[in-house]
Structures are given as C-alpha cells and as structure tokens.
Amino acid sequence: MIEIVRLVTEHNAKMVGVTGRISIGKSTFARALVDALRREGETVQMISTDDFLYSDKELEEKKIRDPRGFPKTYDSASYEEFLTAVNNGDEATHRVYSHEIYDITDEKRTFRPQGITILEGVNLFYDEADEMAFRKYFDYVIYLDQDPKITWEFYFSRVHEHIAAAEDPDNFFYPFRSMSEAEIERISLEYWNDINMENDRRYIAPTKAYADLIVTLDRAHEISQLEESTPKKGVLR
C-alpha cells in the first residue's frame, strides 16, 4: 500500500477512483487506502457509487429492466452533478444506499470535499447512454483484478455472512434463512453468472484499459502485483 500512496500523491490526485468486479473487495481496499493516506498526513474522504443508484420505485417508474449495478440503474445526472461539484471544491448532497434492504433510503448527506476524495464502485465512468463519459472527472484510477473463481468464493462466503446477520424480515437475505444449502448455492451461482459476471464482461472489465494502476489481488485479498498503465483517452462506447 505504501507504493500506491506514493503514486497517488505523486500524481497530486484529488479525485481517485477505485473499481473492479463485484465482491472483489473495492470497499475494503478503498478504506485501507484512506487509512494509509491519512497516516501520511493527507486529508481523505471516501464515498461509493452505490449512493447514486436509482431506488426500486424509480427503476419501476422509469421502466428500467437492467439488473441493479448496470450503468442504466444509476442516476447519472445526479452523479455527474456530484462529480462536478467535488471537482470544483463545492459541497454536494447525495442520497444513501442500504445494503440491508438493497435500496436507496430517505437519508441525505452533505459531502464537503477536502483533500483527496476516493470514490469506489463497479461502474465509475458511465453516463445514461452507457458511454464512459465520466472518466474525465478522475485524476487517478485504480482497477482491482483477480481470478474470477476466487472472487466467486469470496462472494459466496459473503452471502452466508449476510444470511447469518439477517434478523429483520425486511432484510434482502432474510428469506434465505429457511433455504437449504443447495438452494442457496444454486440461487447465488445463478445470480453470479447471469448478472454479476455479465456486468463484469460488458461494462466493468472494459474500464481496465482506462486505469492508471492495475492492482492484482491474491486468494487472501492481499496485493500480489502492481502494474502501472497508460490509460486510454476519449469516450468508450
């Protein structure tokens, strides 16, 4: 992490993006980077693209059928307003996503940019036309990479953690508590292959070419390799 801190600070980056496939550990990595930068005296804040998803109600009203996490399920107008404000050093208001109910809540927060902003999420750059128009707002982008088989194992272990913690009937994972292990695995694998890996193939993996740094993670989610890259320019269609 020391080397990554050096690269971020050498680039004088104020807006840092952390991306990669679902369940690869973006939030964990981003929090570790926040801590490492703060130890070097930097002022750092972190936010997730999850907070810019449409709510279930909005998805229904807009007749958006794409699975949550695909580019069209984000409120790209609000997201771009946020990116513009933060890049200008202005305050920005955003909504809050709940991983318990898997939906946007009624809570709103005010983000006051100071120092470095780390923004983590699966689809950092896409606008409403599925074009990678928002790359221009990021000074430095880190792409997390890993063997998909390892990521699936981590994803499935997290499913079990969520099920064990689901005590509220409104929790997305509460119904799983009455399912057999075979049924849990069948549903999880179906979701993983049909939604998560499809999102990865169509939208997430192509952003690797637009990253400044590719970080490969091993089975223990430790950094095994760093590869500096020259990001592509222009808009990805």
Q: In which residue ranges do the predicted regions lie?
A:
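NTP-dependent small-molecule kinase module
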Residues: M1-R6, R112-P113, M179-R237
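Conserved nucleotide-sensing/catalytic segment adjacent to the nucleotide-binding pocket
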Residues: Q45-S48, L53-Y102
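Glycine-rich phosphate-binding loop used to anchor ATP phosphates in small-molecule kinases
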Residues: N12-A13, S78-A133, I195-T207
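Post-Walker A helix-loop "phosphate-sensing" segment adjacent to the P-loop in P-loop NTPases
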Residues: D35-Q45
